[in-house]
């Protein structure tokens, strides 16, 4: 047999073996994505199955980090995070955690992310600046579950906390948090229930983008309107379209709000 024929046979064999390897990985990965008795459903209505609580997690926003703290989840499971956690005063646990993206809204450094070998990537579910579907399409085929949870919308906050609580075996901690929520809500409701609408304070909630450009306000579809109304206030710009919208400074002055607030970054 000539050297040329031998080399051709070796090359063909390697191609076949690589093809079989890729097929086996793809098949086993698909099976692992759909197996396990620990089942949670995220805020995109995607079901995720786990054999056990994940031990390698990447988180992108401080909302998720705060909820993990509230539930007393061991933060040693965090193997990667965004630049939103780089304030050592607030997040000292994250000083040595690898950076996988500059912020919760920025592009992912996929090489850095894959180097973390995460089981789960926790991301916003419905934030307009994050394409959660595209992220899922890229990460889940390589075995990384994309868990979509917002943690900043009050009407879904308890359900989302419950998802993490179930995933990490912190149901009792969640129960205590929910009881405290209910106690505070009842106290506020009792205090404001007798207040006439004409006496409720008018509130303008500005988006933090207003700090660097023309005013941007939160409207009726934003998470803030629900909180403002629960607290006994009235969002002056609730009827404007969109989640956020630009307004003139004159519009804010003309509204003559009793309270002017900025949302956090």
Describe these PLM feature segments:
Residues 215-243:
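Alpha-helical, coiled-coil/dimerization segments enriched in small aliphatic residues
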Residues 26-29, 36-37, 47, 131-213, ...:
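Extracytoplasmic substrate-binding proteins
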Residues 59-116, 120-129, 233:
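A short, structured surface patch at a secondary-structure boundary
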Residues 1-31:
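Secretory targeting signatures
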Residues 63-66, 84-87, 120-121, 126-130, ...:
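Solvent-exposed loop/turn segments at secondary-structure junctions
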Residues 43-45, 99-111, 130, 152, ...:
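Short helix-initiation/N-cap motifs at beta->coil->alpha
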Residues 225-227, 244-265:
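Ligand-binding pocket segment of bilobal, Venus flytrap-like solute-binding proteins
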Residues 47-54, 92-101, 230-241:
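A local structural motif
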């Amino acid at each position: 047999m000539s050297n040329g024929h031998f080399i051709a046979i070796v090359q063909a064999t390697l191609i076949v073996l690589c093809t079989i390897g890729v097929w086996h990985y793809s098949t086993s990965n698909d099976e692992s994505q759909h197996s396990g008795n620990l089942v949670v459903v995220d805020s995109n209505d995607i079901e995720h199955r786990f054999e056990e609580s994940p031990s390698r997690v990447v988180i992108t926003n401080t909302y998720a980090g705060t909820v993990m703290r509230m539930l007393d989840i061991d933060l040693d499971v965090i193997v990667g995070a965004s630049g939103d956690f780089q304030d050592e005063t607030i997040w000292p646990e994250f000083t040595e955690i690898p950076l996988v993206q500059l912020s919760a809204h920025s592009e992912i450094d996929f090489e850095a992310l894959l180097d973390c070998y995460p089981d789960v990537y926790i991301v916003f579910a419905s934030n307009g600046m994050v394409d959660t579907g595209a992220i899922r399409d890229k990460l889940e085929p390589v075995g990384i579950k994309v868990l979509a949870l917002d943690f900043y919308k009050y009407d879904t906050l308890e359900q989302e906390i419950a998802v993490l609580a179930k995933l990490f075996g912190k149901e009792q901690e969640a129960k205590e948090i929910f009881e405290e929520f209910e106690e505070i809500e009842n106290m506020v409701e009792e205090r404001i229930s007798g207040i006439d609408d004409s006496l409720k304070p008018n509130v303008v909630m500005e988006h933090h983008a207003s700090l660097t450009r023309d005013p941007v306000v939160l409207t009726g579809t934003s998470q803030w309107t629900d909180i403002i109304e629960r607290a006994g206030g009235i969002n002056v710009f609730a009827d404007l379209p969109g989640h956020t919208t630009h307004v003139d400074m004159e519009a804010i002055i003309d509204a003559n709000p009793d309270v002017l607030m900025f949302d956090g970054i």
